[in-house]
Regions:
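Basic/aromatic recognition patch in beta-strand/loop cores that engages polyanionic ligands
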Residues: 186-207
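Enriched for short, Lys/Arg-rich terminal
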Residues: 206-228
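Residue-level recognition of beta-strand microenvironments
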Residues: 4, 99-102, 114, 125, ...
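Short, conserved beta-turn/loop elements at beta-strand boundaries and strand-helix junctions
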Residues: 6, 98-109, 208
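Flexible glycine-rich active-site/ligand-binding loops centered on an Asp-His dyad
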Residues: 109-143
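Short coil-to-beta-strand transition motifs
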Residues: 84-94, 197
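Arg/Lys-rich, positively charged N-terminal/basic patches that mediate binding to nucleic acids
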Residues: 1-34, 40-42, 130-174, 183, ...
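Glycine-rich, pocket-lining loop/helix-strand segments that form or immediately flank
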Residues: 50-78
Length: 228
């Protein structure tokens, strides 16, 4: 999976929270037969089964601290969506935008609403079936009692917006609106950094005012800041 998230910080906590966060699924050579995708474009959404490739779980930990609970309360790992799991597998529901068949790398599936790091291994793809997979009356457990409110994103200098294309700008604004900071680490005067696509975004946050202010945007090329 190729996404704009080159590091863990900033990745949405769940799939679908940021529809503008896009990704491309590129297959290994042995799976590039277009016949394997025949009929997939009849569906609007897909289930993606993938691996937390950057997590190193050396021993089984039965209790974890969900972000929804502010990093203070513990829940059983199987009662949460913690990335630190015994089998290291993730499950995401994404929107199917289109399929490109004429690529030199074989078929490429373009999706949106991703919550995965760039380079994440994909183990399987299945169509999302609303009649079977949607449960409107389902209980959200502790997640329903501890809502994760979005914050208002502002720009310190309007000229910073011109440093990125509109699609990237909108994606960045919506990613930051989810407040990527850890619940236990929300220092008001700290300057945070987030990498998305080829851009390094710096911002400060005010939890009391419910705002995140973008203070700088620097384009990076091959890991180096581009000189303006």
């Amino acid at each position: 999976m190729h996404t704009g998230f080159g590091e863990k910080f900033g990745i949405p906590r769940q799939s679908g929270l940021v529809p503008e966060a896009t990704g491309q699924i590129v297959f290994e050579p042995k799976y590039r037969n277009p016949d394997a995708l025949r009929g997939i474009e009849e569906f609007t959404h897909l289930w993606i089964i993938w691996g937390f490739s950057e997590n190193r779980v050396e021993k089984f930990t039965p209790l974890v601290t969900p972000p929804r609970l502010g990093g203070r309360e513990k829940r059983g790992v199987f009662a949460t969506r913690s990335p630190f799991r015994p089998n290291g597998m993730g499950l995401s529901s994404v929107r199917l935008d289109r399929v490109e068949y004429k690529s030199s790398k074989g078929p490429i599936i373009y999706v949106s609403g991703v919550d995965m790091l760039d380079g994440t291994p994909i183990y399987d793809i299945k169509p999302y079936l609303a009649y079977a997979d949607s449960h409107p009356q389902a209980s959200d457990g502790f997640a329903a009692e501890h809502r994760w409110d979005t914050v208002h994103v502002i720009w310190r200098d309007e000229a910073l917006k011109s440093r990125m294309d509109e699609d990237t700008r909108i994606a960045v604004e919506h990613i930051l609106a989810q407040d990527p900071r850890a619940a236990y680490n929300k220092a008001k005067d700290y300057i945070y950094g987030m990498r998305y696509g080829s851009f390094d975004i710096r911002f400060v946050a005010d939890s009391h005012a419910g705002t995140i202010e973008i203070v700088d945007v620097v384009e990076c090329i091959d890991g180096y800041h581009k000189v303006k």
